[in-house]
Amino acid sequence: MRKIIFIISFLIFTSANAEISKDDENKLTNCTGIYYAYSMIPQGQLELDKIVHSIAAKKFLNSYLIEKGVNDEKLNKELLKIVDELYGKPYDENSVKKCDEFIYKTISNSKDEILKIINSGIY
């Protein structure tokens, strides 16, 4: 009986702390960059709720990626590349929807965590 409990505990613990795949890391980094770029669009050019969503999602993903072992400096360099690409371009609703769907599917509880950030008013 002890062996079964130990094995189950081991499986749960190791899967909870599992690293993310390189492909997921790249997609999440790209989405973080998209949110980052759109969070800087002036309020007069984009609805406030979309800007706030972008800020909250960027904040959540940035923390998540660092927590999963992505190097902070490397992440910032990648984000700046993406922001440079998107800066001055119009808001793309489709890319945001794709990122939202991917994040909600890939990271459990991510939708609720992003909503907590939005509702906290602390971006």
Spans of model-derived segments:
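Short N-proximal segments of mature Sec-exported proteins
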Residues: 21-69
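Compact alpha-helical subdomains of small soluble proteins
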Residues: 49-123
